[in-house]
Amino acid sequence: MFRSLSAIAVALAAAAIAPGASAQTQSQTPAPLSPDKAAFRALYKELVETNTTLSSGSCTLAVERMAERLKAAGLPAADMQILAPADRPKDGNLIAVLRGTDRKAKPIMLLAHVDVVEAKRADWERDPFTLVEENGYFYARGASDDKAMAAAFTDAMVRYASEGFKPRRDIKLALTCGEETPDTFNGVGWLIANHRDLMDAEFALNEGAGGRLDATGKPVFVGVQAGEK
């Protein structure tokens, strides 16, 4: 028996949150969160509860809120850019850079999208834009795809900045819009076409690949994504 998972998201989120974004041991009175896990929980909640649907939401607002958290952690404003087409001001994308020590080494990119599929209230048992935890599971539009990964990546950058961590390579965080509606707008494609220098990296960690664990939790393989729609 095998269990599938998004290997990168799980690896990052596991260190950041106590009651995981999937299952946990059920308890009526969960243990209090440590300060770092509480900080992640607050970031995750803010991101999930920011409506980023195409019809009525704003990716720009979502990435502005994440940028404010990065700025508060000490990441220089000069190392963050929010970019959107002039005719699509709500489809903003955030590029944030944690500077490394080796200027010759190509960057690593942490890539996640913050837009979500439409959510009609009538179709949901709960408000789709209110993060709810029940029996060890989180419920809301985007709680998994892809705001869990976006929150994990942003939280990692917040921690790195606040702790003064200096990686060898630059680490780029790209929070993008339009993954769910590429026929209307594709943030990654637009960034590559218009801001290629900001998107250049040795490789990117993205949601598109994945991996498997066996029944005991031992890693079996990690898939590699070779392209992005």
Positions of the model-derived regions?
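Active-site-proximal flexible loops/turns
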Residues: 9, 58, 119-122, 152, ...
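Bacterial N-terminal signal peptides
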Residues: 7-20
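Serine residues within intrinsically disordered or low-complexity segments
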Residues: 4-6, 22, 27
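Positively charged n-region of N-terminal signal peptides that target proteins for export
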Residues: 1-4, 77
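Metal-dependent amide/peptide-bond hydrolase catalytic core
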Residues: 24-28, 69, 77, 210-216, ...
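Acidic/histidine-rich catalytic neighborhood of metal-dependent amide-processing enzymes
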Residues: 137-138, 144-226
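Short Gly/Pro-enriched turn/cap motifs at secondary-structure boundaries
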Residues: 84-87, 224-229
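Acidic/His- and Gly-rich active-site-bordering loop/insert found
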Residues: 25-143, 150, 160-169
